[in-house]
Amino acid sequence: MLVPKRVKYRRVHRGKMRGEAKGGKTVAFGDYGLQTLESHWISNRQIEAARVAMNRYMKRGGKVWIKIFPHKSYTEKGVGVRMGNGKGTPAGWVAPVKRNKIMFEVAGVPEEVAREALRLAGTKLPVKTKIVKREEVGGESDEG
């Protein structure tokens, strides 16, 4: 699973999820991408589940790029613990993803296989998603 090697601070503020993604809105590496239509926190377990679903369907053919990383920790208080007494202990890692961000990219497989693999990955995530082609999102084309 994806986790940071080390972080400066174990506990971080939640922050805001306003607006859309500043970068990462184009299909840069692959031919097809999975674009989010909502802003949300995506956990490292959800990213891993989506990756496994894609790789299983593609039968280890093609290449997958994961363009998000869970660098933000979230905390939880224990069950039955009263309010106050500081922030809880870190419970896991999330990737804050804003709308229109390309989360996964796929290349090296036929279009039907790529679309189905990305659809399966989308079912593992807590956001509405859309499958996009390189040309549809303003990615660089091969024609010169």
From Swiss-Prot:
Matching InterPro entries: Ribosomal_uL16 (IPR047873), Ribosomal_uL16_bact-type (IPR000114), Ribosomal_uL16_CS (IPR020798), Ribosomal_uL16_dom (IPR016180), Ribosomal_uL16_sf (IPR036920)
Biological process annotations from GO: translation
Molecular-function GO terms, alphabetical: rRNA binding; structural constituent of ribosome; tRNA binding
Gene Ontology terms: cellular component: cytosolic large ribosomal subunit
Listed Pfam families: Ribosomal_L16 (PF00252)
UniProt keyword list: Ribonucleoprotein, Ribosomal protein, RNA-binding, rRNA-binding, tRNA-binding
Oligomeric form and interacting partners: Part of the 50S ribosomal subunit.
Cited function: Binds 23S rRNA and is also seen to make contacts with the A and possibly P site tRNAs.
Homology family: Belongs to the universal ribosomal protein uL16 family.
Name this protein carries in UniProt: Large ribosomal subunit protein uL16
Source species: Lactiplantibacillus plantarum (strain ATCC BAA-793 / NCIMB 8826 / WCFS1) (Lactobacillus plantarum)
